[in-house]
From Swiss-Prot:
Superkingdom field: Eukaryota
Pfam families: Aa_trans
Identification of the protein by name: Proton-coupled amino acid transporter-like protein pathetic
Observed phenotype of the null mutant: Severe dendrite growth defects in class IV da neurons which normally have large dendrite arbors, moderate defects in class III neurons which normally have medium-sized dendrite arbors and no effect in class I or III neurons which normally have small dendrite arbors. Induction of starvation response and altered protein homeostasis in class III and IV neurons. Severe defects in axon growth with mutants showing no defects 48 hours after egg laying (AEL) but severe defects apparent by 120 hours AEL.
Tissues of expression: In third instar larvae, expressed at highest levels in the brain and digestive system with particularly high levels in surface glia of the brain (at protein level). In third instar larvae, expressed in all cells of the body wall (at protein level). Within the body wall of third instar larvae, most highly expressed in epithelial cells and sensory neurons. Expressed at a similar level in all da neurons (at protein level). Widely expressed during embryonic and late larval stages.
GO molecular function: amino acid transmembrane transporter activity; L-amino acid transmembrane transporter activity
S-S bridge residues: none
Organism: Drosophila melanogaster (Fruit fly)
Reported function: Amino acid transporter which has pH-dependent electrogenic transport activity for alanine and glycine but not for proline. Plays a role in positive regulation of growth by directly or indirectly modulating the effects of the TOR signaling pathway. Required in a cell-autonomous manner for dendrite growth in neurons with large dendrite arbors.
InterPro entries from the UniProt entry: AA_transpt_TM
Glycosylation sites: N61
Location within or outside the cell: Cell membrane; Lysosome membrane; Late endosome membrane; Cell projection, Axon
Gene designation per UniProt: path
């Protein structure tokens, strides 16, 4: 258990030195062997958070800013339509339930990641690496599925967020197309506007890391906040009595959940945010970054959905901006602000795609990593823009991909990981973790089925129109 090392200097006697001969006290010094130190570190002495090496860590407030921006995307504009599908009262409780499920799954993913940090002696891991480690450290029957789990998550995340980048490009270009056509009275090519956006998108993709991207997300939050503020101004004008609207609608309630889940879901950015935090422990907890961010997001979602449906009733559009009078300058300002917010959000969505590809090739690019990294950024942005130019109607297809990927990645995979991580330690009293995760899995399957159904209807609707898109 000890090494005896030659020492020519006087030192305070250690416990074992008292039993050495007199000459041994002078000639030798007692030290723990290296293996003893390693064994100690395998216990509670290993702190993955203290050992984490982040050149540009983000503060709690910066992480909260990113989380708000990731959750307050364009999906929030569909909440009034979602409330029309559920009814006013049912919409409130269903929004809280959906937000709780989405937040809990994100919490579970990060919590399992923290447990696996100690088991694998690693200081940070991505979503895919957490799944891989959980399967590798789990029971024997699931260890062979570790590579499949990792690849499935990487493929699903990249497909979803790369497609989202293309959709964001189309959204920004479409809003400016509507405004330019209204102001000038002449039609403008949507594809041309998408091409014009290439350089600005490359510039925002060149922001080196999440630390420097935080101010951009803050600006995006300001733009989105101002846009929503003007929208709320329209919504509170001439409100009818609550009794004139449906309180509970059962027939279209599944459509409410498909809209709300995919609007709130931000599972792809959770681990990148946690991995880049200065104090990762602050991400979880009752007053943690995740709880604070999702509480605020849930409140905004409920207010917009409730007031939007109350104001416009059965005439509520799939996006609340469709109900705003385009001839009035405040409504036009909303379109500009939301377009700018979406543009600023592009960098955060793009970071997920970049991290996936870069983690796979960085070991092969040690000579000029910075140059290769920026070339990769440029190529990915260009590919996203080319996809948007080729298929301006990509939105409905992304709805289908999102329904499939977010249901599995955002709801089902986190609870499966939790079950495997707790396999040996047990699932708690009365197996409550097992029953809880079974309910969440059923919700995920429901979101998958009904979300896919709604997305297919949108695709049919988009291509049943005979007009040429993008000309």
């Amino acid at each position: 258990m000890v090494n005896i090392v030659d020492s020519g200097s006087k030192h305070a006697p250690q416990e074992m030195e008292q039993f050495l001969p007199g000459e041994g006290k002078v000639m030798y010094k007692i030290q723990p062997r290296k293996s003893d130190t390693e064994q100690a570190l395998a216990g509670n002495d290993f702190d993955p958070f203290a050992l984490r090496d982040n050149p540009h860590p983000t503060t709690d407030n910066e992480t909260l800013t990113h989380l708000l921006k990731a959750s307050l995307g364009t999906g929030i504009l569909g909440m009034p339509f979602a409330f029309m599908c559920s009814g006013l009262i049912m919409g409130i409780f269903s929004t809280i339930f959906t937000a709780f499920i989405c937040t809990h799954c994100s919490y579970v993913l990060v919590k399992c990641g923290h447990k696996l940090y100690y088991r694998t002696r690693r200081t940070k891991m991505t979503f895919a690496e957490i799944a891989e480690a959980a399967f590798q450290k789990g029971p024997k029957w699931c260890r062979g599925f570790a590579p499949v789990a990792k690849f499935s998550i990487l493929f699903g995340l990249f497909l979803t967020y790369f497609g989202t980048c293309s959709v964001y490009t189309v959204i920004v270009a479409s809003n400016f197309e509507q405004l330019i056509s209204y102001w000038t009275g002449t039609a403008v090519s949507l594809r041309m506007l998408i091409c014009i956006m290439l350089v600005p998108l490359i510039l925002i993709a060149w922001v080196p890391n999440l630390k420097y991207l935080a101010p951009v997300s803050m600006v995006a939050n300001v733009f989105m906040g101002l846009g929503l503020g003007i929208t709320f101004y329209y919504l509170v004008q001439d409100l009818p009595p609550v009794e004139e609207r449906e309180s509970v609608v059962w027939s279209t309630l599944p459509q409410f959940f498909s809209i709300t889940i995919f609007a709130m879901e931000a599972i792809g950015v959770v681990m990148p945010l946690e991995n880049n935090m200065k104090t990762p422990q602050s991400f979880l907890g009752i007053c943690g970054v995740l709880s604070q961010g999702m509480s605020g997001v849930t409140l905004i979602y409920m207010l917009l959905g409730f007031l939007g449906y109350l104001r416009y009733g059965s005439a509520t559009g799939e996006s609340i901006t469709l109900n705003l009078p385009i001839e009035e300058w405040p409504a036009q300002t909303v379109k500009v602000l939301i377009s700018l917010a979406v543009y600023c959000t592009f960098g955060l969505q793009f970071f997920v795609c970049l991290e996936i590809i870069w983690d796979g090739i960085k070991e092969k690019c040690k000579k000029r990593p910075t140059l290769v990294n920026y070339v990769l950024r440029t190529v990915l942005v260009t590919a996203a823009v080319v996809l948007a130019v080729a298929v301006p109607t990509i939105g409905p297809f992304m709805g289908l991909i999102g329904a499939f990927c977010f249901s599995i990645l955002g709801l089902i995979f986190p609870v499966v990981i939790e079950l495997i991580v707790h396999w040996e330690s047990g699932f708690g009293k009365y197996n409550w973790i097992l029953w809880k995760n079974a309910i969440i899995t059923l919700c995920g399957i429901g979101a998958l089925v009904f979300g896919t159904q709604a997305a297919i209807k949108d695709i049919v609707k988009a291509y049943s129109n005979n007009e040429n898109v993008g000309e």
